[in-house]
Structures are given as structure tokens and as C-alpha cells.
Amino acid sequence: GKDTEGQTGTLAKKYNARKVMIVYGGGSIIRSGLLQRIEESLQQAGVEYVKLGGIQPNPTDPKVYEGIELARKEGVDFMLPVGGGSVIDTAKAIAAGVPYEGDFWDFYIGKAKVKKALKVGVVLTIPAAGSEGSGNTVITKLEGLQKLSLRVPELLRPVFAVMNPELTYTLPPYQTACGIADMMVHIMER
């Protein structure tokens, strides 16, 4: 609902988050003030954070590797994607990769199973793929252009999803239409 992003810190704290990684795409969450509101909410709840920006549509493995490295270095224990499906999928892949000693891609090719993952909470800014409510993630490996999915609902489904409809009001009509088409395709696939 309205202004629910202000509860992000409290929600993360409820799931024992001590240090969060905020994952996001471009600059719209900065320009709109959303990132600042989320940072303030985390600070008020006493939750530390680091940021990983620049996630592109149809996310690729280099950002996942970067996120895993940053999370390990900084002691991150909770993932907080702010955006749509690509940002959420990247955060889920990082969440699975951080506690794993091998290559996170092992999960996607069936070489290993996810046995442990960081918790994920979401602040949704574009309705589309439904990643905020599923344990699925899709990543493209640039080498060989392999686009594969991973489904681990018991570990990768977000523990909360903040959905303030006002965060979608500034989306261009084309982007909203793309999101609606995405929803319909995902429903028909199931």
C-alpha cells in the first residue's frame, strides 16, 4: 500500500537482517527519492547496507559474480532488490551463490543443488514477471549465451514484497503495457 517502502527496515529486521545488499537497476530509484527513503528506513531500524546498482534487463552473470564477491566481502546476510524481475532475479542468484563455495552457475546447469541461501525481501517498482512471489530466477551466462532458469521456492521465494502502487505511477505507458504482456505470458506458461 501507500508509503509501505518506509517499512522496509522493520521488515528486514524482522527476518534478522544485520547487513542488507540493495540491488537496483538504473537511476530512476535515485531520481524519485525511493532509494533515499529505503536507506532511511534501514537506518532507523539499525540495519546496515551496501548497494549494487546497474542491473540491466535480462540479467547476466557478471553482475551476479560481482554481487557475490561484494556480499562476501561486506558480510551481507540479506538481499533487498528494488525494481522489477531482472533486479529480483539477480538478487536471488546472489542469495544462492553467497553461501556456496563453487560457481553459482552450477545451480543453473544442474551440477549442484541450492541447499542454503540468503533471505530475499523485495521492493517492487514494476509489475510484470511475478518474481516478487516466486522462487524462480532466470540469468544469462554471457559465455555461450545460455539463458537458464532455476527454481527453488523453499529458499529463493522472497520473505516479503513491498508493493506500493504509487511507485508504478511514473512508468511510461509502454513499460506498463510490457509488464501486462509479461504477466499474461507467465500465466499462460503455467
Feature locations, PLM:
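An N-terminal, well-structured beta->alpha segment
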Residues: 1-52
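Gly/Ser/Thr-rich beta-alpha loop segments that engage phosphate groups in nucleotides
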Residues: 3, 27, 85-87, 130-132
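Conserved active-site and cofactor/substrate-binding residues in soluble primary-metabolism enzymes
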Residues: 3, 7, 15, 33, ...
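Local beta-strand N-terminus motif with an aromatic residue
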Residues: 17-20, 76, 158
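Conserved beta-strand elements of the Class I
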Residues: 21-22, 78-80, 121
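N-terminal small/polar loop signature for handling phosphorylated ligands or for N-terminal nucleophile
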Residues: 30-102
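A glycine/threonine-rich phosphate-anchoring loop and its flanking beta-alpha core
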Residues: 99-190
